């Protein structure tokens, strides 16, 4: 019987003479070997607390295979190695870098981001070939002055550290193109940054800066400057000289006014939201010919200047959460504007349905109301005003007719539209007619002359008691405003207006909901508040699949039929000011979704 247990391993009789087994290296030898050939070594996310000496000495020490392979004809030519040019030590647990880093003078890229490094070694100055240095997401409080010797450095990433200042010597990095010091503790910036004339991208966001040095204006090649989330109260006038600037971020500061930027003709984006800016004048807008994005949200603007129309290239304008009570009509003339944000402003004088329809409908609305100095026609000059004809009645806005395709004769207190007004249109292709705020008792007969082109008619604030058949012949009409008249009914011939999308009938004398509206399936908006309507037919409203806004406020509705809750297309339903008991005011206050849900719950099953 063997003296060893079955299955057991016999002891090594030479074990006492063998050298102890070496601990497995933190960096596999295969990686080091491959790096000697490629010149690149990636040791990211390996849990390293120190960098192995073999990494620093990769191009100094003779590799182990040199002692094993003396065959000069072999394919593995260990003596033909490449200097290490790229070293990645990111996402480890490093706290310090050895001075032995000087043994890697050929490094072009050094990435040590996402560690716990508190300082850089003085030997960093030996890396004179370094072009990109990423030391972001560490715990560095101070940069060594030796950094100035990195004369080939193009990218320096220092974001998310604990820096309280930048050394004056940073100005010696003469060919630096990218500098990111965001998310640090900087309270000021050295004037020496003005020497970084090759800088293209400069990120100063999320610090504690109260001012920028005047010298920053010397950065003539800078394209992007980000100063978001600081404590800036003003911007130096020298910024206006940064003629290559394309993007300027000044969000979340304490600015009360904007600097004048007369020479920033290449500026494409200006972000100044979340400040305390109260005024915006023409001097801020002129010469910004390339601007495509202007962000002014969360400020205190009360007036938007008419000179906003100078920004012909503007594509996105964010004015949300300001104190704007009105908008300049010239805003409608911006040819490239695709997004206009206005939420949170106390806007008056613009219909809610227009605001709800989005940017393009709002711009169209504003464009149709551009006021241009009136020009008298020859017929007007030869006419003589009488006691029955107000002098203002002989004035025609010919500029609006020719350029805006708008025929406008409003606020004249006229009982008739002068023939000269219609004659002035000539062969122009009129799309908008505005005869509001007069004393008209009927729809002008000659309006039918524009039936092939007109799509928007405003006859609000008159004394019209009925809609003529002439108006029903405007088959291209998409919007009609008849508010504040004395209408009691609508003609059945309106059924032929198959392009009609919006109708405003508020403040008239309707006692019944006009049946003809049920038969116009294209309607999206019906505003018929402040009348005397006593009932509605939900079965007909359900068939109007495009109806999204229905305003029935201040009528005589004694009950709201539960079936109205099945109008799935409704996005805005206004019922306040009626004598019905249900839904209760508390439910109405919750909005359209809650009201429709309540009504559906009342449908008998």
UniProtKB/Swiss-Prot annotation:
Gene3D superfamilies the record matches: Ribonuclease Inhibitor
The keyword Repeat appears for this protein: yes
Repeat region (LRR), residues: 83-104, 106-127, 129-151, 152-173, 175-196, 198-219, 221-242, 244-265, 266-287, 290-311, 313-335, 336-357, 429-450, 453-475, 476-497, 499-520, 522-543, 546-567, 569-590
Pfam family, one: LRR_8
Keywords of the record: Leucine-rich repeat, Repeat
SMART domains in UniProt: LRR_BAC, LRR_SD22, LRR_TYP
Name assigned to this protein: Leucine-rich repeat-containing protein 40
């Amino acid at each position: 019987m063997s003296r060893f247990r079955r299955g057991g391993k016999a002891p090594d009789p030479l074990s006492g003479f063998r050298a102890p087994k070496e601990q497995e290296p933190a960096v596999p030898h295969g990686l080091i070997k491959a790096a000697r050939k490629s010149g690149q070594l990636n040791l990211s996310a390996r849990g390293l607390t120190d960098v192995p000496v073999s990494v620093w000495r990769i191009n100094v020490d003779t590799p182990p295979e040199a002692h094993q392979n003396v065959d000069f004809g072999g394919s593995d030519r260990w003596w033909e190695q490449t200097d290490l040019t790229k070293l990645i030590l990111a996402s480890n647990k490093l706290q310090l870098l050895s001075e032995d880093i000087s043994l890697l003078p050929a490094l072009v890229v050094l990435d040590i981001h996402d560690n716990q490094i508190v300082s850089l070694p003085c030997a960093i100055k030996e890396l004179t070939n370094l072009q990109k240095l990423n030391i972001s997401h560490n715990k560095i409080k101070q940069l060594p002055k030796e950094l100035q010797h990195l004369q080939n450095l193009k990218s320096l990433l220092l974001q998310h550290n604990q820096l309280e200042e930048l050394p004056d010597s940073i100005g010696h990095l003469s060919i630096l193109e990218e500098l990111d010091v965001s998310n640090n503790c900087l309270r000021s910036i050295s004037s020496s940054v003005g020497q970084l004339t090759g800088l293209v991208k400069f990120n100063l966001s999320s610090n504690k800066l109260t001012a920028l040095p005047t010298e920053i204006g010397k950065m003539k090649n800078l394209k992007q400057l980000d100063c978001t989330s600081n404590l800036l109260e003003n911007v130096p006038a020298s910024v206006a000289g940064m003629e290559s600037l394309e993007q300027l971020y000044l969000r979340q500061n304490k600015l009360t006014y904007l600097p004048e930027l007369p020479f920033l003709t290449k500026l494409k984006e200006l972000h100044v939201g979340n400040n305390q800016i109260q005024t915006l004048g023409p001097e801020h807008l002129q010469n910004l010919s390339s601007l495509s994005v202007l962000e002014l949200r969360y400020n205190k603007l009360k007036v938007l200047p008419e000179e906003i129309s100078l920004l012909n290239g503007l594509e996105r304008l964010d004015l949300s959460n300001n104190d704007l009570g009105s908008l300049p009509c010239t805003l409608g003339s911006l040819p490239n504007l695709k997004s206009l944000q206005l939420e949170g402003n106390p806007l008056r004088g613009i219909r809610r349905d227009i605001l709800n329809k989005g940017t393009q409908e709002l711009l169209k609305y504003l464009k149709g109301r551009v006021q241009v100095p009136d020009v008298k026609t020859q017929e007007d000059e030869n006419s003589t005003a009488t006691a029955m004809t107000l002098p203002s009645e002989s004035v025609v806005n010919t500029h609006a007719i020719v350029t805006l395709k708008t025929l406008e004769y409003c606020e004249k207190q006229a009982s008739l539209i002068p023939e000269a007004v219609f004659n002035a249109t000539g062969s122009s292709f009129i799309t908008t007619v505005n005869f509001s705020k007069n004393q008209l008792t009927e729809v002008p007969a000659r309006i039918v002359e524009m039936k092939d082109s007109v799509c928007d008619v405003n006859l609000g604030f008159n004394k019209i008691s009925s809609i003529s058949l002439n108006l029903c012949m405007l088959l291209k009409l998409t919007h009609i405003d008849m508010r504040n008249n004395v209408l009691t009914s609508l003609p059945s011939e309106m059924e032929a207006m198959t392009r009609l999308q919006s109708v405003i009938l508020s403040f008239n004398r309707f006692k019944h909901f006009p049946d003809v509206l049920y038969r116009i399936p294209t309607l999206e908006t019906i505003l018929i508040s402040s009348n005397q309507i006593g009932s509605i037919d939900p079965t007909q409203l359900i068939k109007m699949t495009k109806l999204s806004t229905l305003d029935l406020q201040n009528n005589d509705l004694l009950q709201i039929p539960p079936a109205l809750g099945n109008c799935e297309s409704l996005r805005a339903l206004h019922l306040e000011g009626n004598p019905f008991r249900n839904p209760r005011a508390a439910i109405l206050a919750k909005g359209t979704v809650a009201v429709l849900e309540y009504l559906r719950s009342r449908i008998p099953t």
